[in-house]
Amino acid sequence: MTIVKDLIFRISSLKFAISLIIFIAISSGVGTFIPQGSNSKFYIENFDEAPIFGFLNGEKVLILQLDHIYTSLWFLFALILLCISLAACSFRRQIPSLKASLKWIEYKSEKKFRKLQLNSSYQINEVEDLISKADLFLKKRGWKTYKFKSHISARKGLIGKIGPLVVHIGLIVLLIGSAYGSFTSQSKEQYLLPGESLDLINESTNSKANIKLVDFSIERESDGIPKQFISKLDFTSEDSKFNEVKTAKVNHPIRFKGLTIYQADWAISNIVLEIDNILYQLQLKEIPEIGNQVWGILIELGSETKKNFLLTIDNENGPLKISNTENFSGNNLYINENPLEVNSSKVSLKKIIPSSGLIIKNDPSIPFIYFSFILIIFGTIISLIPTNQLWILVNQESQSLSIGGLSNKNLVGFKKEFFKLSEEIKNF
């Protein structure tokens, strides 16, 4: 039994909880540094030659489950342990403290008043009905009172005692919600061209809808660097009774029927070329070997002898570079400019069609997360409320009035109120 009590004491200690929080925070930070959810080959290829922190190669990353930290056994165990620590602290400290606060404490001796933080004593001429008058006076001032024959116990701000317990409950809900979300959340990356649509199905709420990309645009800085990606999306419910156009931007996601749509990326998916008076819409693919965010396609050009040419583009405004695969010399082609003659073929660029990269995420844990933050914020705010206690004792034999007070916060503020109340009560 002693071992169990000692274990509960250690688990419920503040030092243990803080140590766990620091460990979870560091682990979460590592999770943002190491790519999560990739296949084993990715970690072996990327981290064997350049180990993380100088010693974590691909094999160690996989053994330590650093490739999926948030669903790893040791991370979940840390979350569970922190939940147990917070619950143990609540039952061992917060709840007994709250119960003790609910009990009315009686001070019947003038000697006990002298030991309080604040105390004052007065000689009075009339003691009759003083207790009743003081009781009514305090109630009008917002104090909760318990009246005895010759003394009064009063308190105000008891809700502040509930604050730490509410914060603990909020943290527990947050941890449970985070663990739940790690296993149940789903995400899908989808590229849409203007005019294309996608059916959305939220399995957790059993709701269906259709999303259509109305327009996609890119805002750029003066030096050409992308500043913002903007997708205008048309949402239509399954029964077509609901229709709304919303705009998604980077760091400004859309929430719709339990789903969250993030603006994540972009691409140049298609170009429209006119080759020898015939229009062609060509689908491009990303070519990382050439550079970051470069898209292209290999085509044959020539009215007589056909040759391979590589078409590449890295900007939604152009130009399109046409390169000879033999020596990679080429020319730039701009939208609606005069056609270029390439190997006896006349080529002109009519349209560049960018696509919007969206991440559609379904996370059933979001309501838990929001609710937990509401609890944490509410608990933090009310725990700032000071709990003040007041005692009044009337000694009929000595015709004396003793008043004492305690406050767990803001003693300076309570001191002003205490002496103001004392002056008014003694003059009854």
Curated annotation (Swiss-Prot):
Keywords: Cytochrome c-type biogenesis, Membrane, Thylakoid, Transmembrane, Transmembrane helix. It comes from the Bacteria. This is Cytochrome c biogenesis protein CcsB. GO terms for cellular component: plasma membrane-derived thylakoid membrane. It comes from Prochlorococcus marinus (strain MIT 9301). It is found in: Cellular thylakoid membrane. GO terms for biological process: cytochrome complex assembly. Its main location: membrane. Signal peptide: none annotated. Belongs to the Ccs1/CcsB family. The chain crosses the membrane at residues 14-34, 72-92, 162-182. HAMAP family: CytC_Ccs1 (MF_01392). May interact with CcsA.
